[in-house]
């Protein structure tokens, strides 16, 4: 399995250019946060990595490399990169139970799909009464439960990399805390490389090792999390950090 995945000079376009020459490097055991406002190109960058661009959007330049060798996004999805999506409800077939979803995911990746394995993954993400959960349909579960189920699926995949696209969006504070605890646990136990897409600088401060700031389809600043919080250079980065500090009655040093 690869130890590093690199996005090199990715460019995306629809009727007009959307993403301009984005380069990112994911490394096993480290969390790279991709931050920026809505419409900055974060989710499109993730979609390009996985080969699931929306209709009408095409990649016009760039490549993806695994340990320095060019690779197709289709060869990464699921096997080498697990995904935790922004809207978990859209990721599940409403006609299938959680047992069917989990089992089919495992079988597609050549992983063990016995009930003991599925139960262990569900219990690992804090969903009580795994036997009952496996019988549930998506419409019978809350957003927080579905997000934890997506994390359980990522655990089952045992992929060396994870893309988590706004994993705490639209969740209440308690559910958000649980999801962040689970992501921390995965990093400690499995040490994948993680691309964490978020607009929440509190999430960045808690989980990230490195940060890339995106604005208008471009990476405007990259660095380790401590440097970025203590000495942001770009105006967009300074605005994000200042807004975060203001929540705690603090100001960014000039």
Swiss-Prot record:
Q: Name one GO cellular component term.
A: plasma membrane
**Residues that coordinate or bind ATP:** 36-43
Its annotated compartments are: Cell inner membrane
Going by the UniProt record, its keywords in alphabetical order are:
ATP-binding, Cell inner membrane, Cell membrane, Ion transport, Membrane, Nickel, Nickel transport, Nucleotide-binding, Translocase, Transport
Q: Which reaction does it catalyse?
A: Ni(2+)(out) + ATP + H2O = Ni(2+)(in) + ADP + phosphate + H(+)
Q: Which domain of life is it from?
A: Bacteria
Looking at the record, the residues that make up the ABC transporter domain are 2-241
User: Its Enzyme Commission number?
Assistant: 7.2.2.11
List, in alphabetical order, the Gene Ontology terms for molecular function in this entry. ABC-type nickel transporter activity; ATP binding; ATP hydrolysis activity; nickel cation binding
Gene3D superfamilies in the cross-refs: P-loop containing nucleotide triphosphate hydrolases
Residues folding into a coiled coil are none
Task: Identify the Pfam families for this entry.
Answer: ABC_tran
Q: Membrane topology for this entry? A: Peripheral membrane protein
Residues spanning the signal sequence: none
Q: What does this protein do?
A: Part of the ABC transporter complex NikABCDE involved in nickel import. Responsible for energy coupling to the transport system.
Entry's family note: Belongs to the ABC transporter superfamily. Nickel importer (TC 3.A.1.5.3) family.
Report the protein name in the record: Nickel import ATP-binding protein NikD
* Organism classification: Bacteria, Pseudomonadati, Pseudomonadota, Gammaproteobacteria, Enterobacterales
């Amino acid at each position: 399995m690869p130890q590093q995945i690199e996005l090199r000079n990715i460019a995306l376009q629809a009727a007009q250019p959307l993403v301009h020459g984005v380069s990112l490097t994911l490394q096993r055991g480290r969390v790279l946060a991709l931050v920026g406002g809505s419409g900055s190109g974060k989710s499109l960058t993730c979609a390009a990595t996985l080969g699931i661009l929306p209709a009408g959007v095409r990649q016009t330049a760039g490549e993806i490399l695994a340990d320095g060798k060019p690779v197709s996004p289709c060869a990464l999805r699921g096997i080498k990169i697990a995904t935790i999506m922004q809207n978990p409800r859209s990721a599940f077939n409403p006609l299938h139970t959680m047992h069917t979803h989990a089992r089919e995911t495992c079988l597609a990746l050549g992983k063990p799909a016995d009930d003991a394995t599925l139960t262990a993954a569900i219990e690992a993400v804090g969903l009580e009464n795994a036997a009952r959960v496996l019988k549930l349909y998506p419409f019978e579960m809350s957003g927080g439960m579905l997000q934890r189920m997506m994390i359980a699926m990522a655990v089952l995949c045992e992929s060396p990399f994870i893309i988590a696209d706004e994993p705490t969006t639209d969740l209440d504070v308690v559910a958000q805390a649980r999801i962040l605890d689970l992501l921390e646990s995965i990093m400690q136990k499995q040490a994948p490389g993680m691309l964490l897409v978020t607009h929440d600088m509190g999430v960045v401060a808690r989980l990230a090792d490195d940060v890339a700031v995106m604005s208008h389809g471009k990476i405007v600043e990259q660095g380790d999390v401590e440097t970025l919080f203590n000495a942001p250079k770009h105006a967009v980065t300074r605005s994000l950090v200042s807004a975060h500090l203001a929540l705690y009655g603090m100001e960014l040093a000039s």
